Amino acid sequence: MRLHTGEKPYHCTHCERQFVQVANLRRHLRVHTGERPYACELCTSK
């Protein structure tokens, strides 16, 4: 229902972004932390 009501209860503590789902907030937080959890299968890059 949040999609229809516009409610965004999850807020980023580093900027003004707000999110409907906590998973989207967690993904966004990587912008601020620099975390890159997925490695390339062919080389050492992330």
UniProtKB/Swiss-Prot annotation:
Its main location: nucleus. GO terms for molecular function: DNA binding; zinc ion binding. A zinc finger (C2H2-type) spans 1-4, 10-32, 38-46. SUPFAM superfamilies: beta-beta-alpha zinc fingers. InterPro entries: Znf_C2H2_sf, Znf_C2H2_type. It is found in: Nucleus. Keywords: Developmental protein, DNA-binding, Gap protein, Metal-binding, Nucleus, Repeat, Zinc, Zinc-finger. It comes from the Eukaryota. GO terms for biological process: segmentation. GO terms for cellular component: nucleus. Krueppel is a gap class segmentation protein. Belongs to the krueppel C2H2-type zinc-finger protein family. This is Protein krueppel.
